[in-house]
């Protein structure tokens, strides 16, 4: 072993001596000497690994690009579908609005004709009353007819005014807001009322009214109670009165204790035997108009109320 090492040392020294004699080795020859054997193999492996990394990076970027492209295509498709749906909805709404305007115009013309007929009939009765002023039986016959005709003409004038306002509102994009109620709302004493034909919980009904810039109806007087009662029908109907914290409160802040009340006998009783959990914290109208407390989750009809000009001009 010692002999072999000495021979290797001898050869190495000989190469160095020859190198110094012959001058520095060329760069290419030096690289070949340095990269021969295992070094050359490692360099090849390194280059192969680098190439593999580059291929992986390019493949990953291409895959990400493909996913982004699919996402963009999906988003564009959804956007196109939504846009088409919105255009169709707007077109349908425009057609419905045109039909509503046409219907209201027809009603206005009908009311104008009916009003004119009523005025003519009233004038005729007035003339007859003047001619028969000396008839002893005329007051008992003519006066009731005259009064009835006068009330009829006054009602026709009011209805015509409302319809004319609604047509102007629809034609002028709600520029007459504040002068009349929206279509399908009922005007009474400077307020607008909307009566539902389906059922919701008390909270859902109140939210619905709020979306129309209104609230569940608040009863302030016997006169308002009688007005609302005429439109109730046979269904239980929510009003804007509840006591979730143990004290009855109106949704608009009206004082409950000193205000008008119309409870059924023995109500409110906060009955808890219904099996639905909790008590009865929301008030509703019976078909006869009297009030009762019940579970707020029951799907009852409801009435929205708002000041004149505060409601949404959207038709229901």
Curated annotation (Swiss-Prot):
Ca(2+) 2 binds at residues 218, 220, 224, 305. The keyword Lipid metabolism does not apply. GO terms for cellular component: early endosome membrane; external side of plasma membrane; lysosomal membrane; plasma membrane. It holds the Pfam family Lectin_C. Keywords: Adaptive immunity, Cell membrane, Coiled coil, Disulfide bond, Endocytosis, Endosome, Glycoprotein, Immunity, Innate immunity, Lectin, Lysosome, Membrane, Signal-anchor, Transmembrane, Transmembrane helix. GO terms for molecular function: carbohydrate binding; D-mannose binding; fucose binding; pattern recognition receptor activity. This is C-type lectin domain family 10 member A. It comes from Homo sapiens (Human).
